[in-house]
């Protein structure tokens, strides 16, 4: 991850983009995420169906890379350690949504219900 961050920092500096405002990068992340979402508009493809559609998969990889790049660019510009913040978030999510609880009901709908219940309880506690 450090090598990737270093490469992105050089990429930004070479284009004089190392002075971008975090608000502009946040907007770009949102725009690129919307473009990623647009690939699925009016469809409800599962993982298997998505993997089968090679054309969609190529477009998806491009949009996903855009989101990743902007997110890492923001971390680099703010001198944040991307790996460290991702691992910290993963640890918080592991506590918030324990695997055993999420696996309890094996149906997709049951897992979604458990997720939403946990999320609502969490938000109520943290108001």
Walk through the language-model features, giving the residues of each:
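Flexible "arm" and connector segments at domain edges
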Residues: 1-64, 68-127
